[in-house]
Amino acid sequence: VIKSSSGQGKTTLALKTQYCLQNEYTPYQLINCSDRGTLRHIVEYFHARIRLGEKPLILIDNLDAHLSEWNQLVQLMQSDVKYNYKILITSRENDWYNYAGDLSNIHSMNIIKPMLSKEEAAAIFNTLQQAGHIHPKIKEWKHAWNQIADKKLLIEYVYLLTHGEMIAERISSQMCEIGRNETGSIKFELLRQVCFADVCGIRLSTKKLLRSLAPRTVYDIGQILKSMADEFLVHISQDGDYIEGLHPVRSRHIVEYLHEYYPLEKTAYNITKLADLQDFSVLFSHYPEFSFDKVSFYSDVVN
């Protein structure tokens, strides 16, 4: 189990592990594990692969409600399959608290908590410097380390080294630039909703979002959305059905910036109307993380 806050490279570390072990193990990723009725089929599938000579390395990435039965799956695997496989799990701290379940019946589990250290920060700087990726404004690693030392987020540190500014500074600059544009207000509203949803671990239906925003602007909302994807402000799925933020850490910076004087509970309420029904449990599990008028919010939801 790789467990840490967003921005520490959990998924990258897990995928790197699968890559490094690909000569011995066959990599798999489990996307959904929320229905106990299907667990037996999953176990039977991997049992069949093992009988064919494979050694599966199964990734369960970013625990949430869609993967809530992972604990039961592990118990079934260890009783029915027993050997020649490994399971790799990544989770944010608060999601582990919500979805870990009873760990007493799991026979063997190692929990890794990656945290950027001072020594690693120096090594990363040297590696990036040798590759020519350090921004000219960055002269040495210690000053950059001191800027991120409170949270020690890997993503913040690497961004600072390679771009010469903090993510929050870049976000502030981008938002000011958007605000000067005639389509700024509708772009801000789109970013509020998409990034808030991203921080809550869900993505939004593109059709639902466009339908809700179209009446608020005289401009073509589809073209606005496309331009925002081209500017790497949001990410649209390959089939075009869903839209999400680029990364939870980046999305949180945008949410904080765009809600400095805008009620967060209003965005939270709007997201409840846009989220898919199957995402409700994930969405509402993250609401306690935010400071907003819960009484007003839940009153709007009920009414």
Residue ranges and their predicted role:
Residues 14, 115-202:
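Amphipathic alpha-helical "lid/sensor" segments that cap RecA-like P-loop NTPase cores
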Residues 44-48, 72-75, 98-106, 223-224, ...:
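Short, aromatic/basic amphipathic alpha-helical patches
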Residues 79, 83-144, 155-156, 249-250:
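Alpha-helical sensor/transducer elements of the RecA-like P-loop NTPase core
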